[in-house]
Amino acid sequence: MRTAYFALMIALPAVAAPPHYLDIYNTAPSSLVSIAIAPAGTAAFHESSFAEQPVHGGGDSVTVAIDGDAGCARDLRLSFADGRVLEHKRFDVCKFRSYHTGRYWQRSGMGSTYTAQH
C-alpha cells in the first residue's frame, strides 16, 4: 500500500501555484513607466515596461500578475518618467491586493531613489 501511494505521488504532475494579482494605482504626480518585481531579498527581478503607454499620475491604474510559486513577500521597484525610482522591500502580495504609489512618494521627500519596507 505504501509503495502504491508513493508511486501515485510521483505520477501526479506538479501544480503551479495560482498567480497573485496586484492593482497598482499611480497616485504620484509623475507617470509610471515600469515596475520590476522579485521574490523578497533576491535580485531576480522581472520587469514590465509601460513606456509605450505610461500609467499616468493622479490615479491611473494597471493590474499585474505575479507568479504565485515564490511566496508572498516581494520586492518592488517602480520607475517614473521623471527618473525617480521607488523601491519597496518585502511587500506582501498575499495580504495586499493594491498598491498606491502616492502614499510612499509623499513619505520619500522625493530624492532620486526611495526605499520603503513593510
Q: At which residue positions do the language-model features occur?
A:
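Intrinsically disordered, low-complexity segments enriched in small/polar residues
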Residues: 16-71, 77-118
